[in-house]
Swiss-Prot record:
Disulfide bonds join 4-83, 25-66, 54-78, 90-208, 100-108, 130-146, 222-289, 252-268, 279-307. The keyword Nucleus does not apply. Signal peptide: none annotated. The lineage of its organism: Eukaryota, Metazoa, Chordata, Craniata, Vertebrata. Residues 4-83 form the Kringle domain. PROSITE patterns: KRINGLE_1 (PS00021), KRINGLE_2 (PS50070), TRYPSIN_DOM (PS50240), TRYPSIN_HIS (PS00134), TRYPSIN_SER (PS00135). This is Plasminogen.
Length: 333
């Protein structure tokens, strides 16, 4: 069942070794029947050009191919099926999260794929600049300020199922953005519709949305995740997590903390002693809280005063206040 591909199959590492016409593939390292100087294990060490398996080292839109054993046919495509979604419940990772306590300054590196709704929002050239959360196969929630650089969907792409920020694993999914939706009252929240649905796998699972207007109780322990490149605390490019308590708005708005700046459509979280904060996360990334048996997306990383400073908790968009808007956009688009 795993002998399938995502997208154009650039990351395909399966064992298919015949073309659509049934001709066996030539080994990538061999020079007969066809001599070739490009696409050998030496020229493309990252492309998985082992034995004579079908591969897509050049990202050909028609998918994986190989040089053939027929002297009259240099290369041909292979018939590799698209992977199909498995059904997993929202908010239930297939890998148990580490849940490292918030006393760890700056959080810790996450267990790979334990936060499977975390996405990386990238420029079209592949540079990571914001986080986001998969909330259904076709929809990602992020911060509106992440989309200030361009109003064109083509400027962005989404990477799903990643643990490393660079040197992406071969089975990550890379999907173009079809449309952007900014929240109409100018809240720092936005929806991205993907140009094709994500394939739901054990590494790519949506987070659950909260009930409308739900209020997370004071001192609930929640988790933020991200590659944390926002402030130069370099997590060696691996996904990080940090545990943070939610602070009720009444407390957060006290003079010694955020002094009345937090709106009812926002939520505070952080250790009032400082040390962990969404500098470790990413703008637009998730704040999730475990409830009963699943993780619920309660916050979108929005702003903070400085970074992990004492008495200055991070501020998140309160997702529950926008669930009605989110569900409406998803239903009508």
């Amino acid at each position: 069942a795993s002998d399938c591909m995502f997208g154009n199959g650039k990351g395909y590492r399966g064992k298919k070794a015949t073309t659509v016409m049934g001709i066996p593939c030539q080994e990538w390292a061999a020079q007969e029947p066809h001599r070739h100087s490009i696409f050998t294990p030496e020229t493309n060490p990252q492309a998985g050009l082992e034995k004579n398996y079908c591969r897509n080292p050049d990202g050909d839109v028609n998918g994986p191919w190989c040089y053939t054993m027929n002297q009259r046919k240099l290369f041909d495509y292979c018939d590799v099926p698209q992977c199909v979604s498995t059904s997993f419940d929202c908010g239930k990772p297939q890998v148990e999260p580490k849940k490292c306590p918030g006393r760890v300054v700056g959080g810790c590196v996450a267990n790979p794929h334990s936060w499977p709704w975390q996405i990386s929002l990238r420029t079209r050239y592949g540079k990571h600049f914001c986080g986001g959360t998969l909330i259904s196969p076709e929809w990602v929630l992020t911060a509106a300020h992440c989309l200030e650089r361009s109003s064109r969907p083509a400027s962005y792409k989404v990477i799903l199922g990643a643990h490393k920020e660079v040197n992406l694993e071969s089975d990550v999914q890379e999907i173009e953005v079809y449309k952007l939706f900014l929240e109409p009252t100018r809240a720092d929240i936005a929806l991205l519709k993907l140009s094709s649905p994500a394939v739901i796998t054990s590494k790519v699972i949506p987070a659950c949305l909260p009930p409308p207007n739900y209020v997370v109780a004071d001192r609930t322990l929640c988790y933020i995740t991200g590659w944390g490149e926002t402030q130069g605390t370099y997590g060696a490019g691996l996904l990080k997590e940090a545990q943070l308590p939610v602070i009720e708005n009444k407390v957060c708005n006290r003079y010694e903390y955020l002094n009345g700046r937090v709106k009812s459509t926002e939520l505070c979280a952080g250790n009032l002693a400082g040390g962990t904060d969404s500098c470790q996360g990413d703008s637009g990334g998730p704040l999730v809280c475990f409830e009963k048996d699943k993780y619920i997306l309660q916050g979108v990383t929005s702003w903070g005063l400085g970074c992990a400073r004492p008495n200055k908790p991070g501020v998140y968009v309160r997702v529950s206040r926008f669930v009605t808007w989110i569900e409406g956009i998803m239903r009508n688009n």
